[in-house]
Amino acid sequence: PSRPFVHQLVAEQARRAPEAIAVLFGEQRLSYGELDSQANRLAQRLVELGVGPEVRVAIAMRRSAEIMVAFLAVLKAGGAYVPLDIAYPAERLRYMLEDCGAALVLTQRDVLERLPLPAGLASLAVDDPGEWQDRPEGAPEVDLAEENLAYVIYTSGSTGLPKGVAVSHGPL
């Protein structure tokens, strides 16, 4: 790439200032070192689950420090994240989950219980450390290009149905 990707910039900052605070949410704090290390481990698990370039991963989580780990991990695995507001009605969430073609949903255990997951859609609870925290600490080796998707964000849509807008790594 002509310039580093966002997840590479975070890793660079983690090497430069690992103790500096990267995420502050209420009482939750993550240093750059912790954020990068946790995102690497989760990314390793995501790659094991088939995430890579152009693979979309929905993120349906309460706002928290760990949601930042999830966003970063998807980018490190080469996937494209699709943030979903869990306050939306079940019908709207189901539509977006089906429309975006997500291969996986990252969520939290209590949120998972009320998510309207389409049949066959796999999920991983980020707040279940047994799911991913024993993975290697290094970032997975992923071959990414600027034109690969980074994320898909849904707007309200003029037809009443949410409309997904895809953004690649280049403009990010």
Predicted features and spans:
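Carrier-protein-dependent adenylate-forming modules in NRPS/ANL systems
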Residues: 1-172
